[in-house]
Swiss-Prot record:
Main location: cytoplasm
Protein name: Elongation factor G
Entry keywords, A to Z: Cytoplasm, Elongation factor, GTP-binding, Nucleotide-binding, Protein biosynthesis
UniProt source species: Rhodopseudomonas palustris (strain BisA53)
Transmembrane segments: none
Domain of life assignment: Bacteria
GO cellular component, one term: cytoplasm
Molecular-function annotations in GO: GTP binding; GTPase activity; guanosine tetraphosphate binding; translation elongation factor activity
Length: 690
C-alpha cells in the first residue's frame, strides 16, 4: 500500500510543560477537535484519554508518554504526551529524542515554573524547535505579558507574541491573531468547536498594532528582501510572514507565543494551525546520524528509499497485546512479517503486529514509512534506546544517556507465589524504564529497587500491586551513598598459600589515586618486562572490580578511582588468574583504607516556591536539613528559594512543606552532585550499614 500522507505533511511533536500547566487537557482538546475522541476527558474527573494508566488517572499527572496519531488541515499529527513531573524527566528526554518539534505549555497565572525550565533545557539539549502556548488564560491572576517577560528572564529565550488575549480571567473571550490582524471569538455553547473571526475591539487596536510591529520586526530580520521592503514601508504579506516565523522556529531565532484556555475550549484550533504552520516536518530537521558496522559515522535521511532505521523510545506492557515497543522510523519502510536486526544488541527480530496508537485504541497496519511513530507488538530483545535496522545496511543511531538513580527501597514478597510474580514484573518494569534499576543485596538477599525520587518508586510499587497483583512489604527508602578515596596510596601485596601439591602465589603492586569527580573507575597496567604475564591481567581487574561494589567505609560502591598496576611477581607453577584475583582484591581493599576513603552523599537541587508569609519557616526548615540556600527571588507574589540539600534529609519533605505552608508552597528537586558527607553523618551511616 503506497504512502497516504507525504512526509512533508507530518508533524511529530510533543507537549511539554510543568506539572499542572494543563498539558494533558491541551492534548485532550487537540484529540477532540481533530475528531479522534468523541467525548472530552477531564483530568480532574480522572477520564483523560491520554492518561491511561490507573495510577495517572488517580494522581492526575501524566506518567507515560502515550503516542497518538490525529489529523488537522490535511496534515498528519503524531502527538507524544510527555510527563511534567521531575521524577519522570527521563521520559521527557526520551520523547524529545524522537520529536521534531514541541509545544511548551505555560500556566499564565504562574508563568515559567521550575519544571518548565528543566524541560526547556532538555529541549535546548536536543535542539527541538518550539512554540509556546500560554494556557489557563481564564484563571484568576492570568497574565499573558508576564509570561513573555518570564521567557526572557527565566529561560533566556526570545519570545514573540503572535496572538494577544481579549480579556483575561472570567472575561477571557478569545484572542487577536496578529498575523491576520483579526479577532477570534468562541461561542461557549458549542464546547469551543464554533468560533468566528471579527474585527479587533477598538480598545485593543493600539496594543495589537504595537505587538504586530514587534512581531514583524523580529521576523524580517531573517530575510534581507523582506527587511528591505519593510524599511521602505511595505509590510510582508501573510504567506511571507508565516514563512519567516516558521524559519525562526526551525532555527531557534525566536519562539512564537500563543494564548488560550484549553479547559474552557478557547484557542486550541489556532494552536493546531500554528503546529501545522510553524513546527517542522521530518525533512525540516537535520538528518539523524549513526555509526555503521565499521564504526564510521553515517547519516539516515527521512526518506522511504533510504535503508530502514528506527529507534525504540518507549516500551510498555499492554494487558491485551503483551509487550509494545514504540518506535520512530527515521528512514526506509517497515513491513510486518519482515526481519530486522537490533544493531545495539546484535540480535535478530521479526516484525509481527504493527499498530498505530490512539491514546487507548489501536489500529493494525501492515506498513509504516519514514517519519511514522508506530507501536510494535512482541519484540523479544528490544530495550529503550535500541536501534532496529535493515540487516544488510546496519546502523546504530545515537545512544540515549540515562541518569543514575539516587534513591532505593528494599522490597520483600509476602509469599512464594508473590516471589515468582515479582521477578517477572520487575524484569518488565526495568525494560520499560531505564532510570529504574533492580538489584539484589548479596548479604541480605533482599531485592532492591532504585529510582529517581520518592514519587518514581511509589508509582512503581503501585504498578506492582495493581497491574501485577504482587503483595509485598516495602522498606523505608535508602539513599544511594558512594565512597571514594581522598589521597594517593601505594600498596604491595603478596598472596601465598601452600597446602601440599600445587600452591597459590601472586604478588601485585598498585598505585591508587582519586580520579576527578564523574571520572569513574579507570584501570591501567604499567607492567613492562612481563613481571605479571598478560594472561593474568584480567584476573587482576576482576579482583579490583569485585571490591568496587562494596567499599571499606560502609560497604557502598566506590567511585572515581584510578588504579595503576606498576609491578608484581609470579611463580611458574603456583600462579594462576585466580591467585592474582585474590591478591588484587586484598591489595585494593588495603589501598582504600590507606587512601583515606570517605563517604559521599547525593546532594539535590531543591527549588521551593512559597507565598511570602512562609518564607522564614521554609528557609529555617531547609537549614535544619543541612541545606545551603543558593539564593531567592520573587516570582509574581511568591518567593522562590533555591537550595542544595542532602537527599537523606529530604525524605517526607513534601508533607512537611504542605503543613508548614497550609498546602500553598510547592517544591521540585533533582539530583545535582555527590559531595563528601560530614563526619557525624558518616559515623551514623557506618553504624547503620558497616
Amino acid at each position: 500500500m503506497p504512502r497516504v500522507h507525504a512526509i512533508e505533511d507530518y508533524r511529530n511533536f510533543g507537549i511539554m510543560a510543568h506539572i499542572d500547566a494543563g498539558k494533558t487537557t491541551t492534548t485532550e482538546r487537540i484529540l477532540y477537535y481533530t475528531g479522534k475522541s468523541h467525548k472530552i476527558g477531564e483530568v480532574h474527573e480522572g477520564a483523560a484519554t491520554m492518561d491511561w494508566m490507573e495510577q495517572e488517572q488517580e494522581r492526575g499527572i501524566t506518567i507515560t508518554s502515550a503516542a497518538t496519531t490525529a489529523f488537522w488541515n490535511g496534515k498528519r499529527l503524531n502527538i507524544i504526551d510527555t510527563p511534567g513531573h521531575v521524577d519522570f524527566t527521563i521520559e521527557v528526554e526520551r520523547s524529545l529524542r524522537v520529536l521534531d518539534g514541541a509545544v511548551c505549555v505555560l500556566d499564565s497565572n504562574q508563568g515559567v515554573e521550575p519544571q518548565t525550565e528543566t524541560v526547556w533545557r532538555q529541549g535546548d539539549k536536543y535542539r527541538v524547535p518550539r512554540i509556546v502556548f500560554a494556557n489557563k488564560m481564564d484563571k484568576t491572576g492570568a497574565d499573558f505579558f508576564k509570561c513573555l517577560q518570564d521567557i526572557i528572564d527565566r529561560l533566556g529565550a526570545k519570545p514573540v507574541a503572535i496572538q494577544l488575549p481579549i480579556g483575561s480571567e472570567n472575561n477571557f473571550k478569545g484572542l487577536i491573531d496578529l498575523v491576520r490582524m483579526k479577532a477570534v471569538v468562541w461561542s461557549d455553547e458549542s464546547l469551543g468547536a464554533k468560533f468566528e473571526d471579527t474585527e479587533i475591539p477598538e480598545d485593543l487596536l493600539e496594543q495589537a498594532k504595537e505587538y504586530r510591529e514587534k512581531m514583524i520586526e523580529a521576523a524580517v530580520e531573517l530575510d534581507d528582501d523582506a527587511m528591505a521592503a519593510y524599511l521602505d514601508g511595505t509590510e510582508p504579506e501573510e504567506a511571507v510572514l508565516k514563512r519567516l516565523i516558521r524559519k525562526a522556529v526551525l532555527t531557534g531565532a525566536f519562539y512564537p507565543v500563543l494564548c488560550g484556555s484549553a479547559f474552557k475550549n478557547k484557542g486550541v484550533q489556532p494552536l493546531l494551525d500554528a503546529v501545522v504552520d510553524y513546527l517542522p516536518s521530518p525533512v525540516d530537521v537535520p538528518a539523524i546520524k549513526g555509526i555503521d558496522e565499521d564504526g564510521n559515522e553515517v547519516t539516515r535521511h527521512a526518506d522511504d528509499k533510504e535503508p530502514l532505521s528506527l529507534l525504540a523510545f518507549k516500551i510498555m506492557d499492554d494487558p491485551f497485546v503483551g509487550t509494545i515497543t514504540f518506535c520512530r522510523i527515521y528512514s526506509g519502510v517497515l513491513q510486518s512479517g519482515t526481519g530486522v536486526v537490533n544493531s545495539t544488541r546484535e540480535k535478530k527480530e521479526r516484525i509481527g503486529r504493527m499498530l498505530l496508537m490512539h491514546a487507548n485504541n489501536r489500529e493494525d497496519i501492515k506498513e509504516a514509512y519514514a517519519g511514522d511513530i508506530v507501536a510494535l507488538a512482541g519484540l523479544k530483545e528490544a530495550r529503550t534506546g535500541d536501534t532496529l535496522c535493515d540487516p544488510q545496511k546496519q546502523v546504530i543511531l545515537e545512544k540515549m544517556e540515562f541518569p543514575e538513580p539516587v534513591i532505593e527501597i528494599a522490597i520483600e514478597p509476602k509469599s512464594k507465589a508473590d516471589q515468582e510474580k515479582l521477578g517477572v514484573a520487575l524484569a518488565k518494569l526495568a525494560a520499560e524504564d531505564p532510570s529504574f534499576r533492580v538489584s539484589t543485596d548479596l548479604e541480605s538477599g533482599q531485592t532492591i529497587l532504585k529510582g529517581m525520587g520518592e514519587l518514581h518508586l511509589d508509582i512503581k510499587v503501585d504498578i506492582l500491586r495493581r497491574t501485577y497483583k504482587v503483595d509485598a512489604n516495602i522498606g523505608a527508602p535508602q539513599v544511594a551513598f558512594r565512597e571514594r578515596i581522598t589521597k594517593r596510596a601505594e600498596v604491595d601485596y603478596t598472596h601465598k598459600k601452600q597446602t601440599g601439591g600445587t600452591g597459590q602465589f601472586a604478588a601485585v603492586k598498585f598505585i591508587v589515586e582519586p580520579n576527578e569527580p564523574g571520572g569513574g573507575y579507570v584501570f591501567e597496567s604499567k607492567i613492562v618486562g612481563g613481571a605479571v604475564p598478560k594472561e593474568y591481567i584480567p584476573g587482576v581487574e576482576k579482583g579490583i572490580e569485585s571490591v568496587l561494589s562494596s567499599g571499606v567505609v560502609a560497604g557502598f560502591p566506590v567511585v572515581d578511582v584510578k588504579v595503576s598496576l606498576i609491578d608484581g611477581k609470579y611463580h611458574d607453577v603456583d600462579s594462576s588468574a585466580l591467585a592474582f584475583e585474590i591478591a588484587s582484591r586484598a591489595a585494593f581493599r588495603e589501598a582504600l583504607q590507606k587512601g583515606k576513603s570517605v563517604l559521599l552523599e547525593p546532594i539535590m537541587k531543591v527549588e521551593c516556591v512559597t507565598p511570602e508569609d512562609y518564607t522564614g519557616s521554609v528557609i529555617g526548615d531547609l537549614n535544619s536539613r543541612r541545606g545551603q540556600i543558593q539564593g531567592q527571588d520573587m516570582r509574581g507574589n511568591a518567593n522562590v528559594i533555591n537550595a542544595m540539600v542532602p537527599l537523606m534529609n529530604m525524605f517526607g519533605y513534601v508533607n512537611n512543606l504542605r503543613s508548614m505552608s497550609q498546602g500553598r508552597a510547592t517544591f521540585t528537586m533533582q539530583f545535582d552532585h555527590y559531595a563528601e558527607a560530614p563526619a557525624n553523618v558518616s559515623a551514623e551511616v557506618q553504624k547503620k550499614f558497616a
